[in-house]
C-alpha cells in the first residue's frame, strides 16, 4: 500500500485548481476551486487534510460561508462528528437570524446566521474555499462572537497570500490555515 504524504496531497490539490485569466474582469486571474470538486481524489484529499488538522482540537461546530464554504465545511464537520452551520446572504435562512454588514471594494454586503445556531462556549472552526482580503471572514467571525462562540481558527483551500486577508484575521485573533497558496491578481 502506498502512503501519500501531506505534501503530495497539497500538490494534488494545487494542480487540480484551474486558473482562469481575465475572469470576472480583465486583469484578474481567477482561481477556480470548482475544478477541484470535479476531481474526487483531490476533493477527498482536501477534506482529509482539513479534518486531520482539526481532529481532537475541541472544535464543537464548523461554520461555512456561502456558498463554496458549504462544500468543504459540511464534510469536515461530518468527519469531526460536529454540527455544521451555514452563514448566508440575507433572506436565505428560515429561522430568526442576526446579520453583519461588511465593506467590499465597491459597496457593501451582509451576511446572516441563525440566532440559535451557536451557543455560548462553542469552539467554532470557520471554513471557506478562498481567503483574499478577509472581509467575508471578518463578518463571519463577528457573527459567531456576537452569539457567544469562540473562533480561534479559520481554514481555506486557497490563500491569496498577498491580498491581506490572513493579516486581517490574525489581528482579530484568528489563526489561518490554507492547503495551498497562490498570489492574488
Curated annotation (Swiss-Prot):
Its predominant location is cytoplasm
Q: Pathway it acts in? A: Purine metabolism; AMP biosynthesis via salvage pathway; AMP from adenine: step 1/1
| CDD domains documented for this protein | PRTases_typeI
* Gene Ontology molecular function: any one: adenine binding
Query: Which Pfam families does the protein's record reference?
Result: Pribosyltran
Task: Supply one GO BP term.
Answer: AMP salvage
List the keywords (alphabetical): Cytoplasm, Glycosyltransferase, Purine salvage, Transferase
Task: Identify the EC number(s).
Answer: 2.4.2.7
Mind telling me which InterPro entries this protein's record contains? Ade_phspho_trans, PRibTrfase_dom, PRTase-like, UPRTase/APRTase
- GO cellular component term, pick one: cytoplasm
Query: Which subcellular locations apply to this protein?
Result: Cytoplasm
As its record notes, the protein acts as a catalyst of: AMP + diphosphate = 5-phospho-alpha-D-ribose 1-diphosphate + adenine
Organism superkingdom: Bacteria
By its UniProt entry, which PROSITE patterns does this protein fall under? Answer: PUR_PYR_PR_TRANSFER
User: So what family is this one in?
Assistant: Belongs to the purine/pyrimidine phosphoribosyltransferase family.
State what this protein does.
Catalyzes a salvage reaction resulting in the formation of AMP, that is energically less costly than de novo synthesis.
Matching PANTHER family: ADENINE PHOSPHORIBOSYLTRANSFERASE
Q: How does it assemble?
A: Homodimer.
The name on file for this protein is: Adenine phosphoribosyltransferase
